[in-house]
């Protein structure tokens, strides 16, 4: 077994840097300790690292999880005896085995409750023996804070709120870690002395890079439209610490003309639709996928809608390596597991997911970029009666031999032809799959034979003759029969 002192100068500082770089915790530095706080599904988890003694850390949990904290600290004391254990792998192990820690220490919790119930102090002076023990490590101080809070509530039921707040702040400053506001000051005891004098030191809280980038990107995305969340469905990760997708390739669709485009976006991207010249804007905020998070990132769109995600190029960090060893995966697709081996530790890295899903988080603007309106779409009043013919049998000024109206799928409105649609709407028409007969005003699906299934009439005049027939027959010289003398006459005599 390698001693801790021999490993002090080699990789302990590097492990802390890798942990801060991968998981972006909230960092608070004191004189002798470093606090790394991370939110999780189980609440706020804080790792307290001793600057003077490498590989000596303790875990702090929320107020209602003290019994879990004792079990985790017992495991942490012997975890670094294994040479392959790193700070990042230790944190992931605690999250993955949360339920086992939750059930292993129920007896100790019951004993702690019995000890607290047996103590019944009458005055606040009974708290002095416990307050003298605050010179110990921070993990013990949090347990004492819980005991002190419980006894204060039992001994002083009618005390003022100001007295209780003063008692809590003078006992320890570690309790501020569990408040909603970020702590700016930390109270710690001087080491090596009797521990009666406490020093108050202002701590400048360094902001991590992720929070700065997120704030900058949030300002840029305030003017954009909808916000989508990209998540992997049922991800299966083996020996993966973190996974990032800095560049996203996807297919988008214009909200005006529904024209599809394939793009590749790193942070910001803007383009003009090739069909309707609509401006499309996107902002990609990549996230971090780990065993407890399946969110790939956040996508902000304006003037377009995401349709599908192309194969993704990801950067995967190995969980077993001490340094930040990144392995590149190219073309990760759904339902296709990809396997690679780490270049340093030679362990296999497996990445697999079932599907990529889009979830609409915020709809701040409509599809055209304006504010979202709560009004429903007004129904089109056609002024027609089923069974009776349409006005002019459905013919319009553009197509005088077309006896039908079309219901266009782009706006679900009825027009005689595509030119009538474009003259009334501000977007380009899409193919109409339903028609209204000009003779009976009955709606049906589009058919190539142009025969109404209700009345049997032809909605388009069928050309059967190959002769001129006084202008009622064939008028195209190319398709006209060569037996018709009008086919070879001069053009100024033909019309």
From Swiss-Prot:
Binding-site positions, Zn(2+) 2: 410-411, 421, 427
Q: Which GO terms describe its cellular component?
A: cytoplasm
Q: Which chain positions lie within coiled-coil regions? A: none
The highest taxon in the source lineage is Eukaryota
Q: Which segments does the record annotate as CHY-type zinc fingers?
A: 389-457
GO BP annotations of the record are: rescue of stalled ribosome
Keyword DNA-binding (UniProt): no
User: A Gene Ontology molecular-function term?
Assistant: zinc ion binding
This protein is called: Uncharacterized protein C18H10.09
């Amino acid at each position: 077994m390698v001693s801790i002192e021999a490993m002090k100068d080699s990789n302990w500082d590097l492990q802390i840097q890798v942990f801060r770089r991968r998981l972006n915790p909230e960092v608070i530095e004191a004189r002798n300790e470093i606090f790394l706080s991370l939110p999780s599904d189980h609440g706020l988890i804080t790792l307290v690292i001793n600057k003077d003694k490498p590989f000596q850390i303790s875990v702090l949990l929320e107020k209602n999880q003290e019994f879990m904290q004792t079990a985790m600290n017992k495991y942490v004391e012997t975890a670094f005896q294994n040479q392959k254990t790193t700070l990042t792998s230790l944190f992931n192990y605690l999250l993955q085995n949360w339920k086992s820690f939750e059930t292993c220490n129920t007896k100790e919790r019951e004993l702690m409750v019995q000890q607290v119930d047996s103590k019944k102090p009458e005055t606040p002076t009974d708290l002095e023996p416990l307050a003298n023990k605050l010179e110990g490590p921070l993990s013990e101080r949090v347990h004492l804070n819980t005991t002190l809070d419980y006894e204060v509530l039992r001994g002083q039921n009618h005390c003022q709120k100001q007295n209780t707040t003063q008692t809590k702040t003078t006992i320890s400053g570690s309790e501020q870690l569990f408040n909603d506001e970020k702590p700016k000051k930390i109270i710690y005891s001087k080491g090596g002395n009797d521990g009666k004098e406490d020093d108050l030191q202002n701590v400048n809280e360094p902001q991590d890079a992720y929070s700065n980038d997120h704030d900058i990107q949030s300002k840029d995305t305030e003017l954009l439209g909808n916000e989508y969340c990209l998540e992997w469905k049922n991800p299966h990760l083996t020996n993966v610490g973190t996974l990032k997708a800095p560049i996203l390739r996807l297919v988008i669709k214009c909200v005006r003309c529904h024209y599809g485009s394939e793009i590749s976006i790193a942070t910001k991207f803007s383009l003009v639709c090739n069909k309707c010249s609509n401006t499309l804007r996107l902002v990609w905020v990549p996230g971090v996928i780990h065993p407890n998070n399946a969110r790939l990132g956040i996508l902000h769109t304006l003037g377009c809608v995401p349709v599908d995600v192309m194969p993704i190029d990801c950067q995967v960090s190995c969980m077993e390596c001490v340094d930040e060893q990144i392995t590149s995966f190219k073309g990760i697709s759904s339902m296709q597991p990809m396997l690679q081996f780490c270049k340093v530790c030679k362990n296999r890295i497996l990445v697999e997911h079932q599907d990529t899903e889009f979830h609409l988080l915020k709809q701040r603007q409509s599809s055209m970029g304006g504010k979202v309106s709560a009004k429903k779409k007004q129904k089109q009043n056609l002024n027609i009666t089923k069974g009776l013919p349409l006005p002019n049998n459905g013919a319009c000024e553009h197509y005088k031999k077309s006896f039908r109206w079309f219901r266009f799928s782009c706006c679900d409105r009825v027009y005689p032809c595509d030119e009538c649609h474009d003259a009334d709407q501000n977007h380009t028409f899409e193919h109409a799959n339903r028609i209204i007969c000009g003779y009976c005003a009955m709606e049906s699906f589009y058919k190539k034979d142009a025969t109404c299934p209700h009345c049997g009439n032809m909605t388009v005049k069928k050309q059967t003759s190959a002769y001129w027939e006084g202008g009622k027959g064939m008028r195209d010289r190319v398709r006209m029969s060569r037996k018709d003398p009008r086919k070879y006459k001069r053009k100024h005599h033909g019309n």
